[in-house]
Amino acid sequence: MALDAAVKQSIIKEYATGEGDTGSPEVQVAVLTQRIKDLTEHMKEHKHDYHTQRGLLAMVGRRKRMLSYLKKTDIARYRALIERLGLRR
């Protein structure tokens, strides 16, 4: 399930650190978080969709690694991002 282009652009605009920023950890984690939320809703209806479940777990792992990187490099940005996204950490 891909994100709608308008939704993705609004997330990028909200979390970007500068003009044209799409690759910063904050933006990547925010986009992944939205995709994870969407797939979680999909999985509630389709419990036996194992292909989606595997992709969802891969996204969660990727987000976890990005958050770990951000925590190691800049703890203040990490804490601010966790607070903004409402993640339980």
Swiss-Prot record:
Q: Which PROSITE patterns match?
A: RIBOSOMAL_S15
Q: What keywords sit in the KW lines?
A: Ribonucleoprotein, Ribosomal protein, RNA-binding, rRNA-binding
A GO BP term, please?
A: translation
Q: Does the keyword RNA-binding apply?
A: yes
GO cellular component annotations, sorted alphabetically?
A: cytosolic small ribosomal subunit
Which terms in the Gene Ontology molecular function aspect does this entry carry?
rRNA binding; structural constituent of ribosome
Does the keyword Metal-binding belong to this entry?
no
Q: According to the lineage, what is the superkingdom?
A: Bacteria
| Subunit record text | Part of the 30S ribosomal subunit. Forms a bridge to the 50S subunit in the 70S ribosome, contacting the 23S rRNA.
Function description: One of the primary rRNA binding proteins, it binds directly to 16S rRNA where it helps nucleate assembly of the platform of the 30S subunit by binding and bridging several RNA helices of the 16S rRNA.
Q: Which PANTHER family does the entry link to?
A: RIBOSOMAL PROTEIN S15, BACTERIAL AND ORGANELLAR, SMALL RIBOSOMAL SUBUNIT PROTEIN US15M
UniProt similarity note: Belongs to the universal ribosomal protein uS15 family.
Protein name (database record): Small ribosomal subunit protein uS15
What is this organism's lineage?
Bacteria, Bacillati, Actinomycetota, Actinomycetes, Micrococcales
